[in-house]
Structure formats: structure tokens, C-alpha cells
């Protein structure tokens, strides 16, 4: 008798992560695709200066879905102040059970 083995990936996978516009002047949207059977239990986007200082943490305002998602950012820091022109990094953190996926990319503010 033959036996077939296959894997079922239930945990969400994070793909096609980018922000547009990039560079941006006032605001930008983070877009990404989630694959799997259920969305992550925890999801956040952290924005850092090039020196590594956390200036903003964004959580989705509505539940994420399997497929394409978009999260808006107003270009402001935690205090509600507009960020200065320059280069920044954003880190997307997706948690599902014990599994954590992260993606880090650059974004630029130009006015």
C-alpha cells in the first residue's frame, strides 16, 4: 500500500508587504496579503527612526482577512505630531499561537 503525506498550512503567511505611496508626503497605506485558513491573532506595525527609536505603533482598526489587507497611517507619531522628512523603517509583526512572523522594510517621508 502507498501512503501520501501532505502538509496543511493553517497558520497565516505574510506576503507582498509594501506601503504606498513611498516616499509619502502626508499619509501612506501599508498593504499585504495574508494566506492560510485563519487571520493572525495579533498584528501590529511598528515605525522606527533609522536610529531605532519607536515612534508609532499601529494596530488594525478592523479585523484582518485572508487575502489582501490595507492599513492606513496618517504619518504622525504617538503624540499626534507630524513626523519629520527622512528615512524610517517599519516592522510588521504577525502572531498566531506560538508562531511569529516579521517583515521589516524602509519608508521615506518627503514634503
Give the positions of each predicted feature:
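C-terminal tail/sorting-segment detector
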Residues: 2-10, 17, 81-111
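Glycine-centered coil/turn sites that cap beta-strands in beta-rich domains
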Residues: 7-20, 24-49, 57-65, 69-70, ...
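C-terminal beta-strand of the catalytic ATP-binding
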Residues: 32-34, 75, 92, 109
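Short, acidic, Ser/Thr-enriched surface-loop or helix-capping motifs
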Residues: 49-50, 77
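Generic structural signal for well-ordered beta-strand positions
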Residues: 55-56, 83
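Signal that preferentially marks extracellular ectodomain short beta-strand elements
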Residues: 70-83
Amino acid at each position: 500500500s502507498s501512503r501520501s503525506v501532505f502538509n496543511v498550512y493553517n497558520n497565516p503567511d505574510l506576503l507582498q508587504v509594501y506601503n504606498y505611496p513611498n516616499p509619502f508626503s502626508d499619509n501612506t497605506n501599508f498593504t499585504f496579503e495574508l494566506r492560510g485558513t485563519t487571520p493572525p491573532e495579533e498584528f501590529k506595525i511598528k515605525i522606527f527612526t533609522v536610529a531605532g527609536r519607536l515612534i508609532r505603533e499601529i494596530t488594525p482598526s478592523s479585523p484582518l482577512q485572508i487575502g489582501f489587507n490595507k492599513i492606513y497611517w496618517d504619518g504622525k507619531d504617538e503624540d499626534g505630531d507630524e513626523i519629520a522628512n527622512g528615512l524610517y523603517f517599519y516592522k510588521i509583526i504577525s502572531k498566531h499561537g506560538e508562531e511569529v512572523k516579521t517583515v521589516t522594510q524602509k519608508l521615506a517621508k518627503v514634503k
